[in-house]
């Protein structure tokens, strides 16, 4: 069976020469929910930006849906992998919510009633009533609403893999709980970069720790996230639900 996402010996350095990723190797199985955790500056966001081709590897190989990621396969990769940015302001740029959510599928050729139904379905999936939100101006929304609109825009593309960068950051408790429920319901393969280790424990069966651009641990979440020494060695703390 083809694994939806494979990364082998991925290296990447910033333009100033700073090494951001140093030999990252990982693979995600179909339908798997995986948390990606690590301290600030560990390379999490840089890795995610590689997974739908916003950054291309310095060295190493990425396969998306069985196809090597390269300049010639970017269109396929960006349909296959939906990326949610940490800051929704980086993702919302159209005048209204409806236009933001429609942007992706419209560029894939959807139009008319099929496009409208796609937008309505995506908004409903993230708990936003189309009648209330379609004509809302994105810049007037709360941070939680903006994050949900951004996620609706990703879901409207119907990707096979969801790559989410700090999806719970800035959310109030009710919005966070709604997000957790949604993550457990969505059928896609998911890679979730987060500092919210309680959310990781609740939504992801597997956890990968990266530090200084390298994978330092990879295993079942209930083992990785209960290992106080391992977590503290890499600038993390036990989830609150496990006690500190």
Curated annotation (Swiss-Prot):
The lineage of its organism: Bacteria, Bacillati, Cyanobacteriota, Cyanophyceae, Gloeobacterales. It is found in: Cell inner membrane. It comes from Gloeobacter violaceus (strain ATCC 29082 / PCC 7421). PROSITE patterns: ABC_TRANSPORTER_2. CDD domains: ABC_cobalt_CbiO_domain1. Probably part of an ABC transporter complex. Responsible for energy coupling to the transport system. Its EC number is 7.-.-.-. InterPro entries: AAA+_ATPase, ABC_transporter-like_ATP-bd, ABC_transpr_CbiO/EcfA_su, ECF_ABC_transporter_ATP-bd, P-loop_NTPase. Belongs to the ABC transporter superfamily. This is Putative ABC transporter ATP-binding protein gll0289. GO terms for cellular component: ATP-binding cassette (ABC) transporter complex. Its main location: membrane. Keywords: ATP-binding, Cell inner membrane, Cell membrane, Membrane, Nucleotide-binding, Translocase, Transport. Residues 5-237 form the ABC transporter domain. It is a peripheral membrane protein. GO terms for molecular function: ATP binding; ATP hydrolysis activity; ATPase-coupled transmembrane transporter activity.
């Amino acid at each position: 069976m083809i694994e939806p996402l494979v990364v082998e010996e991925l290296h990447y350095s910033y333009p100033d020469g700073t090494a951001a990723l140093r030999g990252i190797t990982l693979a995600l199985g179909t339908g798997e929910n995986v948390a990606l955790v690590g301290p600030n500056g560990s390379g999490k966001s840089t890795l995610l930006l590689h997974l739908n081709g916003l950054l291309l590897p310095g060295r190493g190989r990425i396969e998306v849906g069985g196809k090597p990621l390269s300049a010639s396969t970017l269109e396929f990769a960006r349909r296959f992998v939906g990326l949610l940015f940490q800051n929704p302001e980086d993702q919302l740029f159209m005048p209204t919510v409806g236009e933001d959510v429609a942007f992706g599928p419209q560029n894939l050729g959807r139009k008319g009633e099929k496009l409208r139904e796609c937008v309505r379905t995506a908004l409903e999936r993230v708990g936003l009533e189309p009648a209330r939100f379609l004509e809302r101006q994105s810049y007037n929304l709360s941070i939680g609403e903006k994050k949900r609109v951004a996620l609706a825009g990703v879901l409207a593309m119907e990707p096979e893999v969801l790559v989410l960068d700090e999806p719970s950051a800035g959310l109030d408790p009710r919005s966070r709980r709604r997000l957790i429920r949604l993550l457990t319901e969505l059928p896609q393969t998911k890679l979730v970069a987060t500092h919210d280790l309680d959310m990781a424990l609740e939504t992801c069966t597997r956890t990968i720790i990266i530090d200084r651009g390298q994978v330092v641990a990879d295993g079942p979440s209930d083992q990785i996230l209960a290992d106080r020494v391992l977590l503290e060695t890499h600038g993390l703390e036990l989830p609150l639900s496990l006690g500190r």
